């Protein structure tokens, strides 16, 4: 309860201090209108920054009911696809089986049971885990290894272990690693141009795809995420920032966005590197779009959010999500309901 109250106080403080805020009377008027139109308490009005001066089309943003209508739709989502998408191990194995590029699987674990090179090992202590990871790094000639929860979301349950600091990192993360189910993968060698923006995290592009009733695959939108403050994850729910991407040119556009609980800042430059976002052209962008459409043909759930990384050799699929909250893409697009296909999506839901 105290955590929720503190979060509410922080949000109120951010709204009051926001120099780009509309007048309180206008905000109140729009809240009532949004409430009537959407038929629900308009908490998304603040969470999606619809109180800011540049937002005049606030009713074009999805309500929680509209999001639930899409994400819970049995017409748009099928269990046989979502069961693969929601299990990161199954997803990576399925992609590998169909020769679609994903970070190479090294091993995986179910709590203290580890599966490596067709062997099952029981690991029950920090020392045993250290010895095991050290062995993997040496046998695979790896400097780092990335670990993520098989069912986690939003950067939760992710760890980056390095040969250089392995002892310290194992002491810090062993308890969590041994208490969850994880997939261990090679670290992607990120493209140098993307590293110029922020080098400490794997910065991914989120593509939303939709298969219409004629089985045509559409890319609805794209935005790119970057980590901040030394973080090795780029997720907005972990404090990262994100920007809209022009689907035709592959260039970043506008200022960055950030979730309100992390300050909701709008920036022209990355806060750590001072790299100017506007018009940065993403390498291998056309290849990324082609890869996404190919991936959809192998996993034809009708709406998926795909995360794509850009390596020095081309795009790599990180994961797909059928249970998209649509908060970040809705903000990045500037109101998803103005998209020409969203009327059809809601009708099909």
Regions from the language model: what does each represent?
Residues 148, 185, 223, 319-323:
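Active-site ExK catalytic segment of metal-dependent nucleases
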Residues 193-196, 293-295, 304-307:
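Generic recognition of flexible, low-complexity loop/linker segments
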Residues 88-205, 210-213:
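Active-site nucleotide/adenylate-binding loops and adjacent lid/helix of ATP-dependent enzymes
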Residues 197-198, 202-287:
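ATP-dependent carboxylate/phosphate-activation module, predominantly the ATP-grasp catalytic core
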Residues 142-144, 202-206, 219, 303-305, ...:
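Extracellular structured ligand-interaction cores
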Residues 265-290, 294-301, 310-349:
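C-terminal active-site "lid" helix and adjoining low-complexity regulatory extension at the edge
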Residues 7-135, 292:
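Conserved N-proximal alpha/beta basic substrate-recognition cap immediately N-terminal to
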């Amino acid at each position: 309860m105290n955590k929720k109250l503190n979060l509410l106080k922080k949000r109120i403080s951010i709204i009051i201090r926001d120099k780009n805020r509309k007048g309180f009377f206008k905000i109140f008027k729009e809240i009532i209108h949004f409430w009537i139109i959407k038929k629900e308490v308009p908490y998304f009005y603040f969470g999606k920054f619809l109180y800011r001066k540049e937002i005049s089309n606030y009713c074009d943003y999805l309500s929680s009911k509209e999001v639930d209508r899409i994400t819970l739709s049995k017409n748009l989502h099928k269990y046989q696809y979502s069961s693969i998408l929601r299990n990161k191990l199954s997803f990576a194995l399925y992609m590998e089986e169909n020769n679609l590029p994903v970070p190479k699987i090294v091993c995986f674990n179910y709590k203290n049971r580890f599966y490596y090179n067709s062997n099952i090992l029981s690991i029950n202590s920090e020392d045993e885990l250290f010895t095991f990871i050290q062995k993997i790094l040496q046998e695979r000639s790896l400097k780092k290894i990335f670990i993520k929860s098989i069912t986690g979301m939003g950067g939760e349950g992710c760890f980056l272990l390095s040969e250089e600091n392995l002892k310290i990192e194992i002491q810090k993360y062993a308890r969590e690693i041994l208490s969850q189910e994880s997939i261990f993968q090679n670290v992607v060698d990120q493209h140098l141009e993307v590293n110029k923006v922020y080098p400490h995290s794997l910065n991914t592009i989120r593509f939303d795809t939709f298969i219409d009733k004629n089985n045509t695959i559409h890319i609805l939108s794209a935005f790119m995420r970057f980590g901040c403050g030394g973080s090795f994850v780029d997720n907005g729910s972990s404090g990262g920032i994100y920007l809209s991407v022009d689907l035709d040119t592959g260039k970043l556009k506008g200022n960055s966005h950030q979730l309100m609980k992390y300050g909701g800042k709008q920036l022209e430059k990355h806060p750590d590197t001072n790299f100017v976002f506007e018009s940065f052209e993403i390498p291998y962008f056309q290849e990324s779009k082609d890869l996404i459409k190919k991936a959809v043909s192998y996993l034809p759930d009708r709406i998926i959010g795909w995360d794509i990384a850009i390596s020095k050799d081309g795009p790599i699929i990180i994961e797909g999500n059928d249970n998209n909250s649509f908060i970040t893409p809705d903000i990045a697009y500037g109101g998803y309901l103005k998209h020409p296909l969203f009327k059809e999506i809601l009708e099909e839901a």
